[in-house]
A protein has these predicted regions:
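Intrinsically disordered, low-complexity Ser/Thr/Pro/Gly-rich regulatory segments
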Residues: 1-216
Length: 217
């Protein structure tokens, strides 16, 4: 079983496709995989200001690399004349553009961390249409079949993830995973637990103020 962040699916998750994939990744990927669901970040560049980013899934293997996955459920359609995507009758955002943009934004977010490894690390993006079967053809010039997860791929999702990593790596033998040091940074950036407690001095001052208020009453 893969290690999941969060370890239980957020009850607020509305997408049935994401719910289904969460369980499949958890149960069918080996334990050396780490999968982050519904990852959000805020990225800022001095010349551009700040903007939000969110990825449906980030799939990471310490030796293979990092994959950003955008999920769209239901029947999928693309209208070339208007460049509009649809899920059933509903217009949706371009999933390829979302995945590509989120990949680059997440790369930049991680590289801003002082402990992110200074070596070639494989980043890639992919799109999931888990409710339909795509067939063997590439869907668009920027959406080859190799980076599309469809219903037929769910039977062996580990094989599909391996295929995507191989597609992005190509002949770049030096490209690899983040390693144990990079995995630690990923958890620190995307899934860090923390708590804030009042300083003792603040607590004492509040107690003293309360005594004054009670005395005045």
């Amino acid at each position: 079983m893969a290690r999941m962040f969060p370890e239980r699916l957020d009850p607020s998750t509305e997408s049935s496709a994401e719910k289904r994939l969460y369980a499949i990744f958890r149960d069918r990927l080996p334990q050396d995989f780490v999968v982050f669901h519904s990852v959000r970040w805020l990225l800022r560049e001095p010349s551009q200001g700040a903007w939000n980013g969110e990825a449906d899934f980030v799939i990471v293997h310490p030796e293979r690399g990092l994959l950003v996955l955008e999920v769209k459920g239901g029947p999928i359609r693309y209208e070339a004349r208007t460049r509009q995507w649809f899920s059933g009758p509903h217009p949706i955002r371009d999933p390829v553009g979302q995945a590509r943009r989120n990949q680059h934004d997440l790369m930049e977010k991680l590289r801003q961390h002082p402990r992110w490894p200074d070596r070639p690390i494989l980043f890639g993006h992919a799109v999931a249409f888990p409710d339909v079967e795509v067939g063997p053809r590439d869907l668009l010039p920027d959406l080859p079949r190799a980076i599309v997860l469809d219903r037929s791929d769910l039977r062996d999702v580990e094989r599909w993830v391996s295929r995507v990593f191989s597609y992005w790596k190509g002949e770049h033998a030096s490209m690899g995973g983040p390693g144990s040091d990079g995995m630690a940074v990923l958890r620190d950036v995307l899934a860090r637990s923390w708590s804030l407690r009042p300083l003792l001095r603040s607590a004492v001052e509040e107690a003293e103020q309360r005594i004054v208020e009670l005395t005045e009453e």
